[in-house]
Amino acid sequence: MDFNFSQDELDLRDGAREYLRDRCTPEVLRKLVEKNSADLGSWSEMIEMGLVGFLVPESAGGLGMCNTGFVLLAEEAGYVASPEPLIDVAGVAAPILALLGIDSAAEIAGGTSRVVTAHSLNPYVNQLQPTDKVLQFKDDAVSLSDASDIEVDAAESIDPLRRLSKIVSAKSIPIASGDEARHLAAKAASKGALFTAAELLGLAAAMIDMSKNYVVERKQFGVAIGTFQAVKHHLSTAFTKLEFARPVVYRAAATLSDDDEHAALHVAHAKIAAGDAAINAAEAAIQVHGGIGYTFEADLHLFMKRVWALTGLWGDRNYHINKVDRAVFDRRSKLGPATTFQSAGNAEGH
């Protein structure tokens, strides 16, 4: 298994980073909150850059890239707390529709259609627009609906930049049922959890960087508070948790791309690790910011609230811990030192 990123993936990551950090600044996010809006107005530009069609096959007008590369995009979107529904549309809906050979995947890549997602692990539709379509995973069926054929109730979010809708009823077109629908729902859940984990990595990195800059500028007793050992410990612990979580997420992306039998388990581990790292980063950031960290004056709250919203999305911590527990205690699972050393012995020809 190759854990290295391709040069194309790194180049696209760098382009997305430059664009997002210029386009989606804390000042821009604050203005959206003040206007009671969550529309960044960057969707068409993200389509032109190929970000929305990243996972759509080239034959359908996309870039034909894989999960490992999209993880990098999700991480960059998290770093700026982008309100755009990139994961739901480009990370989940587009590749699922492409698997089914449905034209909507090409329409997403081309920008003529936008399809958001509703799933039992992601029941609230984010940023639903009147011209959108909704890919709904419910019971043993997968269906596609126009937003105009759906009745929704508005739902509140702790994050002011997430505009949620709960589907009450829908006139939908079934596109899969039975075993196929269950298989697609599981794939969607894995993709959603993986890319949300990557977004949490980006949020954690942003809060650590914001805190690092603050403790260098903030002075007490004539010196920067970043020189105090207690402050160093808070941020070094947060940074260590982040760096230990990142390879877990990257490993999950690689195994999911390869359809590894343990991919769902690796995704569960990734969601746990990234969620823990992001929560720890938020707590450390508030601690080192002091009193201002609890106010709206600090940009920190925009990122912290996004973390709180995302940790429960596509399966909360308990959901994924239970999944890992079942795998660990399942005697059929190839886990533990016996498997590890047996594999090593086989590799050496023993």
Language-model features, listed with the residues they occupy:
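Alpha-helical interface subdomain recognition
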Residues: 1-80, 178, 187-350
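FAD-binding core of flavoproteins
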Residues: 81-91, 95-209, 213, 338-350
